[in-house]
């Protein structure tokens, strides 16, 4: 295969990260036809099965038609309210407040009162038990089409949980920077294999308040189109120029990098002060995994910086739970800014920034999250320390490794069974985030209610949180789920899928054993 000029210096970096020469095609990218290409030898097996199957045409048409019908009925009901033929339960502005700026835009207000109110019983369900694979929902009923709810049960607090929290509070006290916070930061740095780390009390603010400290005017941010809202907000607050590349598309990213290097800033054409590439390890709504080796190769080639959000991947992927850097076997030092949260795998709250010591020292004095926010609470800090030590095996057991292995097995089993049934599934085979496409708004609501009737709690997401034709249910697989639990959910999924005609996939799925499964390692007895 002839080497093209567009390959440039990209191939040495790719080869260094484990990509072989025969995998490289035109413009330095893989020959394979998948939408997102194929990764390194270490993780190529999981990227070759990362499909984004499109909905059949009739499903897309019916989805648009469904939104059109409910919108038409919404305007009709607004008319009936205006003439007094239907009671209006929505809060009304006082006459003397008519000149005030409205809290909601016209469309948002219309959508809330006519569409969301009819189905809001499927969201914000009150949970009255501890987090776990099985939980209790408080029963509630509505006599006015979800404008108000009557709660039928009491919320019972767990006395043992309160006592354990009080004991931790007495043990570590409430000083701003206690030794427990320093212990956690050192533990995070060791876990990730970097020089230093810094923790924050809120995961969302870890992104939104730190990005403005890293870049500003005269800088360029290249952001994946499916990045989390916290990353988008942080980019906007920074004042930097923002350009969005197609999801996990290396051709789109390199095209923007080339243009940024060659053309510079608009009008003046001066070089950008910094170019920051912002990606996620596992994308929360798609379940896809970033093509990290290729992003690192492009970052090195064009002298850019890389910001990696591992909120959903840290503690979930990799042989020892160290995230996508371990999954792809890349050097953590190649990622300039490593961000993650403690709300998923560690069962707590807050987030962290990790990397070189100079970076962390700079953020301690320039980050709004560090200067103006309060420190992480001692109970949450202790919870994270114990969870991380369990994953690292520092508690003297192999329980952490067992859970990571169990999560990988559960993820692959759950995904493969759903594909066999005929559901359209997004994301990577190693991703515990499993989106099941439902498409039509009426079926989204019916799916959530039918699953709850079978005592299965699910999270459904629709427009405007997703594209109008890509409403979905999002399952997050846990290591605590047993095979019997998964089979129970799958049986209900199969039944409801047939009932509501949700099996849209036109692909025939034939499960094959993975001969290179990295999760098949022996645990110490």
Which residues does each PLM region occupy?
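PLP-dependent enzyme catalytic core of the Aspartate aminotransferase-like
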Residues: 1-22, 27, 48-51, 55, ...
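Conserved N-terminal helix/loop that builds the PLP phosphate-binding region
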Residues: 13-19, 23-31, 35-176
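Conserved PLP-dependent catalytic core of the aminotransferase class-I/II
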Residues: 116-118, 290, 358, 378-429, ...
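Short loop-beta-helix segment that forms the pyridoxal 5′-phosphate
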Residues: 185-209, 245
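Conserved PLP-anchoring active-site segment centered on the Schiff-base-forming lysine
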Residues: 210-229
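Short, glycine/polar-rich helix-capping loops at beta-to-alpha or helix-loop-helix junctions
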Residues: 225-233, 359, 469
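Active-site phosphate-binding strand-loop segment of PLP-dependent enzymes
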Residues: 243-308
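Active-site PLP attachment segment
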Residues: 320, 326-362
């Amino acid at each position: 295969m002839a080497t093209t000029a567009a390959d440039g210096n990209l191939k040495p970096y790719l080869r260094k990260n484990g990509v072989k020469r025969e995998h490289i095609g035109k413009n330095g990218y893989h020959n394979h036809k998948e939408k997102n290409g194929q990764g390194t030898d270490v993780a190529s097996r999981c990227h070759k099965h990362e499909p984004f199957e499109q909905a059949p045409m009739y499903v897309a048409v019916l989805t648009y038609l469904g939104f059109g019908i409910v919108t038409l009925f919404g305007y009709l009901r607004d008319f009936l309210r205006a003439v007094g033929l239907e009671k209006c339960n929505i809060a009304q502005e006082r006459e003397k407040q008519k000149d005030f700026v409205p809290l909601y835009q016209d469309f948002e207000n219309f959508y809330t009162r006519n569409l969301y109110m009819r189905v809001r019983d499927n969201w914000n369900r009150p949970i009255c038990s501890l987090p776990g694979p099985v939980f209790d929902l408080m029963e509630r009923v509505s006599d006015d089409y979800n404008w108000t709810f009557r709660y039928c049960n009491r919320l019972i607090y767990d006395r043992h949980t309160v006592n354990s929290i009080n004991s931790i509070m007495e043990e570590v006290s409430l000083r701003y920077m206690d030794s427990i916070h320093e212990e956690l930061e050192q533990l995070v740095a060791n876990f990730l294999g970097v020089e230093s780390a810094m923790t924050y009390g809120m995961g969302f603010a870890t992104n939104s308040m730190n990005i403005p400290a890293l870049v500003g005017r005269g800088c360029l941010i290249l952001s994946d189109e499916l990045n989390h809202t916290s990353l988008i907000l942080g980019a906007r607050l920074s004042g930097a120029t923002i350009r969005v590349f197609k999801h996990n598309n290396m051709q789109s990213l390199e095209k923007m990098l080339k243009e940024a290097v060659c053309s510079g800033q608009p009008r003046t054409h001066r070089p950008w002060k910094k170019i920051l590439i912002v990606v996620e390890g596992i994308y929360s709504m798609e379940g896809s995994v970033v093509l990290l080796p290729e992003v690192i190769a492009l970052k090195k080639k064009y002298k850019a910086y890389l910001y990696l959000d591992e909120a959903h991947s840290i503690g979930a992927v990799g042989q020892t739970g160290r995230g996508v850097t371990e999954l792809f076997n890349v050097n953590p030092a190649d990622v300039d800014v490593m961000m993650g949260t403690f709300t998923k795998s560690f069962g707590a709250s807050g987030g962290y920034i990790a990397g070189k010591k100079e970076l962390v020292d700079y953020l301690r004095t320039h980050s709004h999250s560090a200067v103006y926010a309060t420190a992480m609470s001692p109970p949450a800090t202790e919870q994270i320390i114990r969870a991380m030590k369990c994953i690292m095996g520092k508690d003297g057991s192999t329980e952490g490794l067992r859970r990571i292995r169990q999560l990988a097995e559960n993820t692959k089993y759950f995904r493969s069974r759903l594909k066999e049934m005929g559901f359209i599934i997004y994301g990577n085979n190693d991703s515990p985030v499993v989106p099941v496409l439902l498409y039509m708004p009426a079926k989204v609501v019916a799916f959530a209610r039918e699953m709850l009737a079978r005592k299965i709690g699910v999270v459904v997401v629709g427009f405007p949180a997703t594209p109008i034709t890509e409403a979905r249910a999002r399952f997050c697989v846990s290591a605590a789920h047993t095979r019997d639990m998964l089979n129970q959910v799958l049986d209900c999924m199969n039944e409801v899928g047939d009932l509501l005609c949700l099996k849209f996939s036109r692909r025939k799925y034939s499960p094959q054993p993975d001969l290179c499964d990295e999760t098949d390692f022996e645990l110490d007895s």
